[in-house]
């Protein structure tokens, strides 16, 4: 059994970048970094860092199914979201964690979105929602550089905080 498993799902590469940062910060050699969509058997670990990309305010069914199957583990969540961090997201995802696990905390940073999202925003524009669409497009444009170096550093600080809570 591994000490640490960094398991992630990444549609655009954003969450994969944060996963690699988290993995590099974990001590020792008893660790692995795996895409949840792998065909390989996912090994057991004492501590799971589980990453996801946010779609419609939560994680995918693959991630929620994996979370709900864990028992007696220490779990930290991380993710990327085009709209940025929101405690609501972490709450919705952590709800899949069974009570016999130790939920350590979460880290979410902004991630770039596909160009089709910007095009969808533009197609939704009306006189009534013009200001709201402007804010969505402004956020989209700000997200283009994320996750950036500062996000990566914040992910490492997150790991440092989680390591203080972890019992191996």
Please report, for each region that a protein language model flagged, where it lies by residue:
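N-terminal beta1-alpha1 ligand-phosphate binding loop
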Residues: 2-25
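Structured loop/turn residues at beta-strand edges in well-structured enzyme cores
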Residues: 2, 43, 101
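Short acidic low-complexity segments
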Residues: 32-44
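FMN-binding flavodoxin-like domain, especially the glycine-rich phosphate-binding loop
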Residues: 25-30, 47-168
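General secondary-structure propensity
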Residues: 1-8, 139-145
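Secondary-structure junction/capping motif
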Residues: 13, 31-35, 60
